[in-house]
Design a protein with these regions (language model features):
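N-terminal export and membrane-targeting signals
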Residues: 1-12, 108, 167-171
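C-terminal region of N-terminal signal peptides and the immediate post-cleavage residues
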Residues: 8, 17-40
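Catalytic nucleophile-elbow at a beta strand-turn-alpha helix junction centered on a G-D-S/GDSL motif
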Residues: 39-57, 61, 131
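Sec-exported extracytoplasmic/periplasmic mature domains
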Residues: 75-79, 101, 116-120, 177-187, ...
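Conserved N-terminal glycine/acidic-rich loop preference
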Residues: 121-124, 147-185, 192, 196-241
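Catalytic His-Asp segment of secreted/periplasmic serine-dependent ester chemistry enzymes
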Residues: 196-295
Length: 295
């Protein structure tokens, strides 16, 4: 997701090896099972993966990567053989597969260039910028006390057409094609599509976060719909989907500051508005590492 410019002045988650010995030879030494070979890991994605404003910022400045983002957490936990993080704030699907990304640090290569036949593990978080998720959320901000004339859900679903749902339907085939392109580059790689989390609880928490209840529910339901589309594409294109909504329930932008996995409109943690916090990145990284170890 892009770092939004908000009008109030803010710019903008071993396998246990049991050794079995023969009953007839209780004293025989049983060799340890060989450890899994270290993985060659590549991380692709947008700012939901890169970690803007989370200390310490590393890599290309224009991509706003943190050394505490979930790819770094995964790499450390799995003790990978090699690790390449090409996640970049503002990325859209085309920046992964075909079009260099323009940033404040200059054009960045297509992210897929980092994937090779030797790559064993790929994580990817993409889609939020494709459908304008953050800009939609920013457009729903209001400091009015009444919902009259201030419900962006009504505007975004005017005439019976849900524009966000339409954008998801339009972009979903491209997500599948992107996964095919990754698999073509790394035929033996395990590909994990990492979804977007629970940013808002039911009804939100207006005015603590300046999104009216109807709009909070609309935004989160749109995130859920995008996740479902990403999951479907993953399943249809030989990848796996990592659900981060469930693990982030109770850790949304309305949670206590030290419990947030996603930062609010006015940041109270070192993270970009409406983006993961360091705690969120740690939780997401833990979940991914656990999934990789389990199979």
């Amino acid at each position: 997701m892009r770092n939004p410019g908000i009008y109030v002045g803010i710019a903008v988650a071993v396998s246990l090896l049991a050794a079995c010995s023969s009953p007839s030879a209780p004293d025989a030494d049983v060799p340890d099972a060989p450890a899994s070979a270290p993985l060659n890991y590549v991380a692709l994605g947008d700012s939901a993966a890169s970690g803007p404003r989370i200390p310490e910022q590393v890599g290309v400045p224009g991509c706003e990567q943190s050394d505490s983002n979930y790819p770094h957490v995964v790499a450390a936990q799995l003790e990978v053989a090699s690790f390449v993080d090409v996640t970049c704030g503002g990325a859209v699907t085309e920046n992964l597969v075909s079009t260099p990304q323009s940033t404040s640090s200059g054009d960045q290569p297509v992210q897929l260039d980092a994937v090779t036949p030797e790559t064993d593990l790929v994580t990817v978080t993409i889609g939020g910028n494709d459908i304008g998720l953050v800009s939609t959320a920013v457009g729903c901000l209001t400091f009015a006390n009444s919902s009259t004339g201030n419900v962006c859900k009504d505007r975004l679903t005017a005439g019976g057409v849900d524009t966000v749902a339409a954008a998801i339907a339009d972009k979903a085939p491209g997500w599948g094609a992107m996964l095919d392109a990754v698999a073509e580059r790394a035929p033996d790689a395990r590909i994990l599509v990492v979804g977007y989390g629970t940013y808002l609880p039911d009804g939100g928490c207006f005015p603590t976060q300046p999104v009216l209840p109807e709009d909070a529910d609309y935004i989160q339901s749109s995130i859920t719909a995008m996740n479902q589309a990403l999951k479907t594409q993953a399943e249809e294109h030989g990848a796996e989907f990592v659900d981060t909504e469930a693990l982030s329930v109770g850790h949304d932008v309305c949670a206590a500051v030290d419990q947030r996995y996603f930062e609010g409109v006015i940041p109270e943690n070192p993270a970009a508005p409406l983006h993961p916090t360091a705690a969120g990145m740690a939780a997401i990284g833990d979940e991914i590492a656990s999934i990789v170890r389990s199979e």
